[in-house]
């Protein structure tokens, strides 16, 4: 990996020499990165390069995969999340995740958003306010405020994805991971999610996996390029797209492979 950004004054997440294996297959190789607070970091690279595997290390989703082994260090706000005393459920409350395809629960719009706060012991009398605030923050309140008891699955794809973002926001995370959140959406819905993401970075640290080079260039502050399990280059997005240090980075973003 080229030098790029070495020391961030306020890193929300610090990754040091991260390696991951699925059985005998090594999927991540000596990945180190510092993700700044209240920023959008985009992860780009061809399919199978390790991007999604990497972000699942940031909230220990890989714990759920059999035969997965991890070495290295991932610190969030100075705390190593792989220490034995770390509660993975509490970690995932603080590091929320939005997936590639909208995955609302088969329940009402209201109950989708209230689900997480209920699990974490929210006071019943506070739920209405929590739900409204999350839906407003996800820019969907005006579209659903008069039908909160309707099935979430009755919403359009773009609305469902914003509902899933609201569901994530409802438990008040500090970091949000997006794994290709617009790949299943139409261009108009994609633009709304992008606008929302840029608005959310005021209050959250955001890491987004995307195959869309234009999307990464439009919305992110920092970009990391992965190839075959290695972080090839990590820098400010402007630097990556205008003057990459590595030829393989330039080849990828100009469409020579991928």
Curated annotation (Swiss-Prot):
Gene Ontology molecular function: any one: ATPase-coupled phosphate ion transmembrane transporter activity
Domain ABC transporter stretches: 13-253
Membrane topology: Peripheral membrane protein
Family in the record: Belongs to the ABC transporter superfamily. Phosphate importer (TC 3.A.1.7) family.
Catalysed transformations (reactions): phosphate(out) + ATP + H2O = ADP + 2 phosphate(in) + H(+)
BP terms from Gene Ontology: phosphate ion transmembrane transport
The protein's name in its UniProt record: Phosphate import ATP-binding protein PstB
PROSITE patterns: ABC_TRANSPORTER_1, ABC_TRANSPORTER_2, PSTB
Protein's cellular compartments: Cell membrane
Cellular component terms (Gene Ontology): plasma membrane
Pfam family, one: ABC_tran
Record EC number: 7.3.2.1
Binding sites annotated in the UniProt record for ATP: 45-52
Keywords: ATP-binding, Cell membrane, Membrane, Nucleotide-binding, Phosphate transport, Translocase, Transport
Subunit description: The complex is composed of two ATP-binding proteins (PstB), two transmembrane proteins (PstC and PstA) and a solute-binding protein (PstS).
Species: Methanosarcina barkeri (strain Fusaro / DSM 804)
Function (record text): Part of the ABC transporter complex PstSACB involved in phosphate import. Responsible for energy coupling to the transport system.
UniProt main location, coarse: membrane
